């Protein structure tokens, strides 16, 4: 059940020189009579892994494979520092015993076989991404130049738009040949022009609605509807008050006097002062317009000025009569 001294010495030597693993296995097998269960117990191997111990070099990787695994592992570490297997060191047979290297390489190869394809895909995509970006950049930069219309072209297009807002294909083709433009450009111009026309129509409609909306009415005191004889007193707005007091009766104002009281007998009266009584009564059911000032006539001159004016008119008439009489006397026959 115990190993011989030769076997232990060979195990110690194998720890120092892993290349002597086959000789160590052969010596141990010869010494213990092909009984390797103690080593299996120490290393934790099962009976199914016995052939692996007997033939340790069967599943080991070759030198090119090791180089490829190391290079891919370095790429995975550089490209993906958070890779779950990126921190696993690659073991070599020169650092540890051969059986440890065999098991570690088997585990690492089995676990990384599924990851190698992903690493290769990532590396290929990283290599191809700059080229694809260079190919996609010209596509993004490619943009159609804006069409600059001349004055003649715009004039012809506007004339055609006045005739019809929706010209057919034949009309557009004829117009395109006339103005030396592609038919597609003409079609796009008509689309833009119709959109502009619709916006203008909406603006005009909104302006008309604002213009037709009722204006705000002024808050005025209620007015009496009985516009009868001129002697009736009418309520005056505070901003229309005359220098006279509001308690002054209307018939005392010179403007509301009758034609016989305010004028002399020889001076003809005006028509608006000779309004009959029946006409004033017929105006009773009529109401004044909503935005019209009340019919209140205020004289600009005081009462003294009116008296002086009437007296001056009378004196002028007297002077005229005297002058006519004097002229008649001078033209009498001698």
UniProtKB/Swiss-Prot annotation:
Chief location category: nucleus
Motif annotated as Octapeptide motif, chain positions: 37-44
Keywords: Developmental protein, DNA-binding, Homeobox, Nucleus, Transcription, Transcription regulation
Subcellular location, record wording: Nucleus
Segments of skewed composition (Basic and acidic residues): 118-131
GO cellular component: nucleus
Organism from which the protein derives: Psalidodon fasciatus (Banded astyanax)
Entry similarity comment: Belongs to the paired homeobox family. Bicoid subfamily.
Protein name in UniProt: Retinal homeobox protein Rx1
Physiological role: Plays a critical role in eye formation by regulating the initial specification of retinal cells and/or their subsequent proliferation.
An example Gene Ontology molecular-function term: RNA polymerase II cis-regulatory region sequence-specific DNA binding
GO biological process, one term: positive regulation of transcription by RNA polymerase II
DNA-binding region: 142-201
